[in-house]
Amino acid sequence: MSNINPDRYLKKLAYLPLLMLSACSITPEQPDYVELISVEQQRVNEWQNLSQQTHVAYLNDLVDSDMFDELLKIAMQSNPDLQQMLLTLQIRQSQRIQASGEKRPFISAGASAQNSSDSDTRFGADLSVSWQADLWGKLADNERAADLDITEQSLLYQSARDTLAAEVMQVWLTLIAQQRALDIEQQRQASLQQTEFFILQRYRQGLGTLEDLDSARSAVASSSADIEALTESFRQQTIQLKTLVGQVNNPEFTLPADYPDVVIPAIDLPEQTLNRRPDLRAAYAAIQASSARTEVAYKDLLPSLSLQAVLEDVGSSPRASLFTAPVWSLLGQLTAPLYQGGQLRAEAEIRELETAISYQQYRDTLLNAVTEIEQALSQEQALVKQQQHIETALAS
């Protein structure tokens, strides 16, 4: 049995083209952030050229050390901050399933039993299917925003892995340098103590002065202070390494006797280098996600169309109520927000401003990236020149 007049609903659907034309006037034009980002990147100056550059695929290829690779592996598995980033990525993936589910029909079933004093027990069963038509692409925009959230979080996770690898590498190299400095200072102290002993023997024999003895003892004491400072600095770096690898107890490691070879990665053009950085790509994905949510907020001002089909049956027994003689109905509902105190319009404006904030956050990330690269290249260039001057001085 049918409860609807199809012709009446077809006539009402004729108004949909008019509603779609009105949607074009409600949704505003957003700034072309792609063009703005391209302009920002083109303003970056060329990088300094460094000699002896090497193409590497991974950060741990910069340092040839099995012990460092083992520590880095532990850090990737145990660092709590990195694990939080991974869990957040899994949350974004589940949220994407939620957003995708809004585009699909909702199906529900129910059963009931009714008993009264003046009638027999009646049993009922119903099956309903509801679906919201995506007239304006609002649900598609919401799903696209969820996809971009996954892209952003995945890139942030990659950036966090790169940052963690760089921090572990820096602490590892610092520990090697401090251990070498501590060994040198201990050897120097042994030499100073030997000198102090000779001066003391000469002083006892009346061949030296008290000033020479005081100077020797001061040098030994100063060296002892330097050893304490180096030892504490080494201990602090060990604690920092323990935090990075995500362990409460001190990690077991063996420092190499010599400095490891550290290669200089190849530097490409600024635009190519910046476009490969995961933090910048994540910031760009955040702009796109915010822009998609702005579209969703403005489309909330438009009418929505939902359809619902219900199949129900009633019988004197549970078996008889299982759709032996069902009654079906179809409901089409077109709802338009007329007045909500300006909340929907304010929400759309907020989303638009959040997109502008995402763009400024991209600019901030870009500035930090350029600063990091330029400072690293400048420091490396200065170290190369210092090494050349030292080699010249030693050869003289």
Regions found by a protein language model. Name each.
Residues 84-99, 160, 164-201, 218-231, ...:
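Amphipathic alpha-helical coiled-coil segments
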Residues 68-70, 122-124, 170, 215, ...:
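Transmembrane beta-barrel architecture of outer-membrane proteins
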Residues 72, 126-128, 172, 270, ...:
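Membrane-embedded beta-strand positions in outer-membrane beta-barrel channels/transporters
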